């Protein structure tokens, strides 16, 4: 200001100057304004804010003298003036030189479409930024709108003392560096003064605003905000684990946990008194505590060790483990065991959802969760649900709701959809009945697992997470052991006067008893005697003799030679209908078959004996033939004989009987007299009578001694023993609907 006042008193009038001199004077006035020191002593300093022309000249003059004194002590070289950078709140990064600070909305409207860039100065003029800054401050003062809080004060000296503008707080105030060599950073004392004076109140104001916003929200909005915060936390943890962990191998699957460690997930080691985590829980392993709380499961690395073992297993071994898990779940002995298995599976899935772990679609827990809701409903259906849920006899509305939670939703028509899908998508906490809430948890977890496995099969190169499919936030609200607590609590709190209802509850919670009075079998079917391979001939003969003495009728005596030839092969073309059915049920195993002994009957009633020759005919002929055989036995009173395969062809015996077309051990009876002689098979052996019908005498036919037959060829691997074949584990997809009819 002193320079301009001196120029106005001593300089000639503008009318006496030429046009060139007037332009130069005008440029000098805009560029060298507020510079009271000579050019050679001038140094870069903080620009002062324009004050009123009538009262601030003296104070600025004294301030300039202090600045000149400080410059003379430092002896800093003269450098071209630059546009200062405007630091942010964190004082770590300044704005670029060509971006001025933003203006308030009212100032932008006042300036028009150009905004804050209406005056940028001249590139060749030093201090051009000061003119634009002063103009912006005047615009901000006229708008009476406070700007961003980090433009709170301007520091006009090197000591960082704030300069106030006549008590007017609406002026635009900015912070500029005190040294030209440190653009983008401020003096430490200035930073401390700034944060201590303006950041505290602003932070308090911000917290007050947030508190008011939270008070204005309803329950749904608060719940959505909580979900968003949890999602942000999981994303931050995943980024931290990805940055700190090792990169996975190129050959490892996308769901591999190589980059996830207990340290990156912030998990504590599991307690030492727990049972060792293993993928194959067996009873012979060292015992330990298996009751774990919610915090022990969710915030330790116990489940992480189990999941890592699943990833390390080879695919065949993992599939066998899946089958073992399926049979353990589907054969749960009581309701207590099934609830423990369900909570184990749901807690395992909750662990993945909480820590944002990628899911292995071939996990044993993920393979079995799909059928748990139907299994749980089957166990609960043994109870008196009408009395427990509706307090009445028979099913009511609550029972129907429980069944609709379990059933598969279907589309009724193209325009009308079944409301079962909407019911199953409801959040579990919206159900008031404890059993409904427990079933809703199981149903929601099952739907999430099925959707994830379907998506994983479609998109193989992308890891899948549970939070992508948890639409009703069932995994977020589930706590470990919630299903058992809800159902067992409902059964414990139920009170009624119905004794049968109480008995059903007791039987459902206790292990089932093995109650069987007898084990029936069909004497017309063919039994597989390979299970009695260790039985000797003498023992079998003794049992047959004892049975014959008790019956007082016909008895059967198998011989040593008959048991020696049990392994003979038969022609598949000569199999009967009963034989083919039995072969299909036992994987076409050509095991030796023998007709079962008839049950005990009174002596007055004749016994019916069936041979394999009779089984080859149709049902009508079988019935007629059996009746004729009974009558023939009554009339003639002949013996019941066996036929062996070790005897070569020979002339038939006087007693002709119906012979089988097979070379196995058969039960024979005489042919009826009125039916004529049956067709004889020339390559069969004679009939050997064992004992007469009346038991007074027995006739023994001479049998030609022949060398033993050659040993049968070894069976092919596909025709192994039926018991061994049944022990082989099928694939998982085939096992779910496994039956004997599908063995072909």
UniProtKB/Swiss-Prot annotation:
It comes from the Viruses. Pfam families: Herpes_UL69. Residues 72-85 have a biased composition (Basic residues). GO terms for cellular component: host cell cytoplasm; host cell nucleus; viral tegument. Residues 1-202, 580-724 are annotated as: Disordered. Residues 1-11, 153-171 have a biased composition (Basic and acidic residues). It is found in: Virion tegument; Virion; Host nucleus; Host cytoplasm. Residues 706-717 have a biased composition (Pro residues). One of its GO terms (biological process) is regulation of DNA-templated transcription. Phosphorylated by UL97 and host CDK1, CDK7 and CD9. Phosphorylation by CDKs impacts on UL69 nuclear localization and activity. Arginine methylated via N-terminal arginine motif. A zinc finger (CHC2-type) spans 387-501. Residues 179-202, 691-702 have a biased composition (Polar residues). Residues 613-625 have a biased composition (Acidic residues). One of its GO terms (molecular function) is zinc ion binding. Keywords: G1/S host cell cycle checkpoint dysregulation by virus, Host cytoplasm, Host nucleus, Host-virus interaction, Metal-binding, Methylation, Modulation of host cell cycle by virus, Phosphoprotein, Transcription, Transcription regulation, Virion, Virion tegument, Zinc, Zinc-finger. InterPro entries: ICP27-like. The keyword rRNA-binding does not apply. Zn(2+) binds at residues 387, 494, 496, 501. The keyword Disulfide bond does not apply. Belongs to the HHV-1 ICP27 protein family. Self-associates and forms a tetramer. Interacts with host DDX39A and DDX39B; these interactions are required for UL69 function in mRNA export. Interacts with host SUPT6H. Interacts with host EIF4A1 and PABPC1. Interacts with host PRMT6. Immediate early (EI) protein that plays many roles during productive infection including regulation of host cell cycle progression, regulation of viral gene expression or nuclear export of intronless viral RNAs. Acts as a transcriptional transactivator via interaction with the cellular transcription elongation factor SUPT6H. In addition, acts as a post-transcriptional transactivator that mediates the nuclear export of unspliced mRNAs via interaction with DDX39B, a component of the cellular mRNA export machinery. This is mRNA export factor ICP27 homolog. It comes from Human cytomegalovirus (strain AD169).
């Amino acid at each position: 200001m002193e320079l301009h006042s001196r120029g106005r008193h001593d300089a000639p009038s503008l009318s006496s100057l030429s046009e060139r001199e007037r332009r130069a004077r005008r440029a000098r006035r805009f560029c060298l304004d507020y510079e009271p020191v000579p050019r050679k002593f001038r140094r870069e300093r903080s620009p002062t804010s324009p004050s009123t022309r009538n009262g601030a000249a003296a104070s600025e003059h004294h301030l300039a003298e202090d600045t000149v004194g400080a410059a003379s002590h430092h002896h800093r070289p003269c450098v071209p003036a630059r546009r200062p950078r405007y630091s942010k709140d964190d004082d770590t990064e300044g704005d670029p030189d060509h971006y001025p600070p933003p203006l308030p909305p009212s100032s932008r409207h006042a300036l028009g479409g150009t905004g804050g860039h209406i005056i940028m100065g001249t590139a060749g003029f030093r201090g051009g930024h000061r003119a634009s800054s002063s103009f912006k401050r005047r615009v901000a003062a006229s708008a009476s709108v406070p700007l961003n809080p980090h433009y709170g004060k301007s520091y006009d000296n090197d000591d960082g003392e704030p300069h106030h503008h006549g008590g007017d707080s609406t002026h635009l105030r900015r912070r500029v560096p005190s040294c030209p060599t440190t653009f983008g950073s401020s003096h430490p004392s200035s930073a401390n003064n700034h944060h201590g004076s303006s950041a505290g109140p602003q932070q308090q104001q911000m917290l007050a605003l947030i508190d008011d916003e939270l008070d204005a929200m309803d329950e749904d909005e608060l719940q959505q905000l909580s979900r968003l915060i949890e999602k942000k936390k999981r994303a931050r943890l995943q980024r931290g684990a990805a940055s700190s962990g090792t990169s996975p191998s190129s050959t490892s699957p996308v769901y591999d946990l190589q980059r996830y460690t207990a340290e990156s997930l912030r998990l504590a080691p599991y307690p030492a008194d727990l049972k060792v985590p293993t993928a194959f829980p067996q009873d012979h392993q060292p015992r330990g505590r298996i009751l774990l709380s919610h915090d022990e499961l969710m915030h330790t690395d116990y489940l992480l060790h189990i999941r890592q073992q699943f990833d390390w297993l080879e695919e065949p071994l993992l599939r066998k483990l899946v089958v073992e898990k399926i049979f353990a779940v589907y054969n749960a002995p009581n309701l207590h065991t099934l609830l423990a298995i369900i909570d184990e599976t749901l807690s395992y899935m909750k662990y993945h959802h909480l820590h944002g772990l990628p899911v292995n679609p071939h996990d044993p827990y993920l393979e079995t969760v799909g059928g748990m809701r139907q299994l749980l409903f089957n166990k609960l259906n043994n109870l008196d649900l009408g009395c427990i849920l509706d307090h009445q006899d028979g099913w009511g509305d609550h029972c129907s709701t429980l069944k609709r939670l379990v059933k598969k939703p279907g589309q009724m028509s193209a325009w009308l959809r079944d409301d079962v899908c909407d019911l199953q998508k409801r959040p579990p906490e919206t159900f008031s009945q404890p059993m409904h809430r427990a079933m809703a948890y199981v149903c929601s977890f099952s739907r999430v697992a099925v959707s994830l496995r379907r998506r994983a099969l479609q998109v193989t190169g992308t890891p899948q997470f549970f939070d992508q499919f948890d639409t009703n936030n069932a995994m977020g609200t589930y706590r470990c052991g919630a299903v058992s607590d809800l159902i067992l609590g409902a059964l414990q709190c139920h009170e009624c006067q119905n004794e049968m209802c109480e008995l059903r509850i007791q039987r459902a919670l206790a292990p089932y008893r093995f109650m069987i009075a007898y084990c029936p079998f069909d004497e017309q079917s063919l039994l597989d005697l390979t299970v009695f391979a260790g039985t000797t001939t003498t023992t079998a003969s003794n049992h047959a003799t004892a049975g014959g003495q008790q019956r007082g009728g016909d008895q059967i005596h198998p011989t040593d030679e008959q048991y020696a030839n049990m392994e003979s092969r038969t022609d598949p073309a000569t199999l009967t209908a009963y034989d083919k059915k039995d072969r299909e049920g036992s994987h076409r195993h050509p095991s030796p078959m023998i007709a079962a002994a008839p049950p005990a009957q009174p002596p007055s009633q004749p016994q019916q004996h069936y041979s394999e020759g009779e089984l080859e005919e149709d049902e009508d002929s079988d019935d007629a033939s059996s009746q004729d055989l009974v009558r023939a036995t009554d009339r003639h009173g002949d013996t019941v004989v066996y036929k062996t395969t070790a005897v070569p062809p020979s002339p038939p015996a006087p007693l002709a009987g119906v012979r089988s077309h097979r070379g196995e051990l058969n039960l024979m009876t005489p042919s009826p007299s009125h039916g004529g002689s049956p067709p004889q098979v020339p390559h069969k052996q004679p009939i050997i009578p064992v004992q007469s019908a009346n038991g007074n005498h027995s006739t023994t036919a001479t049998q030609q001694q022949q060398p033993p037959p050659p040993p049968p060829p070894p069976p092919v691997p596909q025709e192994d023993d039926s018991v061994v074949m049944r022990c082989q584990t099928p694939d998982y997809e085939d096992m779910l609907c496994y039956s004997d009819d599908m063995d072909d």
